[in-house]
């Protein structure tokens, strides 16, 4: 009886006790940190609470931890972006650049984190509210169809820098243990989409519309016309926007 009693006590306190949530460590993976470009970290040692036989562990702890990590990363990214006062004409946002030995299989980390944050927000809704908040169920469509993909310097070859000059984008960056390729995450208007003849949802009786690819500046290793190699801000495709002009009366 004594052994049975001790076993029951140990089991009881074992179920009541939950392992503490360890802090998520962010470690840079497979890319070189260089001026203006942040390395992409991974959520590595994320150990959640141990789930007991009675299901005493709450999933909100894990969600709160992920939200905390996401907010820290997004806040850190805001510090990387220059102030609007010093940069009204160019967006220096450089999370679209990655140095890697192979083609990245997923979008940049911050893109995934924003999607996951939206998923966490939706997870807190009731099933009915979640269905009504789904853009597909509300009939929401993008004004312009766009595509995003990773491209290499071999695809770009040349680019325009901030001074308006044409520079050669170097395909490989030398590092201590070899070389890494430069990859750029570009977004542009989809030439095979349904909006190549004009923006979606625009009244053609009163407006002329066109989907256009816009560019932003990112930092990359380049070579100018004088064979000088260095890190420069170059323009890459980053979005597809709708431009409108009013139709004049005849």
Curated annotation (Swiss-Prot):
Propeptide: 19-131
Biological-process GO terms, alphabetical: cell surface receptor protein tyrosine kinase signaling pathway; modulation of chemical synaptic transmission; negative regulation of neuron apoptotic process; nerve development; nerve growth factor signaling pathway; neuron projection morphogenesis
Keyword annotations from UniProtKB, A to Z: Cleavage on pair of basic residues, Disulfide bond, Growth factor, Secreted, Signal
PTM comment text: Mature BDNF is produced by proteolytic removal of the propeptide, catalyzed by a FURIN family member. In addition, the precursor form is proteolytically cleaved within the propeptide, but this is not an obligatory intermediate for the production of mature BDNF. Can be converted into mature BDNF by plasmin (PLG).
PANTHER family linked to this entry: BRAIN-DERIVED NEUROTROPHIC FACTOR (PTHR11589:SF3), NERVE GROWTH FACTOR NGF -RELATED (PTHR11589)
Family per record: Belongs to the NGF-beta family.
Summary of the function given for this chain in its UniProt record: Important signaling molecule that activates signaling cascades downstream of NTRK2. During development, promotes the survival and differentiation of selected neuronal populations of the peripheral and central nervous systems. Participates in axonal growth, pathfinding and in the modulation of dendritic growth and morphology. Major regulator of synaptic transmission and plasticity at adult synapses in many regions of the CNS.
Subunit structure of this chain's protein: Monomers and homodimers. Binds to NTRK2/TRKB. Can form heterodimers with other neurotrophin family members, such as NTF3 and NTF4 (in vitro), but the physiological relevance of this is not clear. BDNF precursor form: interacts with the heterodimer formed by NGFR and SORCS2. Mature BDNF has much lower affinity for the heterodimer formed by NGFR and SORCS2.
Name this protein carries in UniProt: Neurotrophic factor BDNF precursor form
Species whose genome carries this gene: Bos taurus (Bovine)
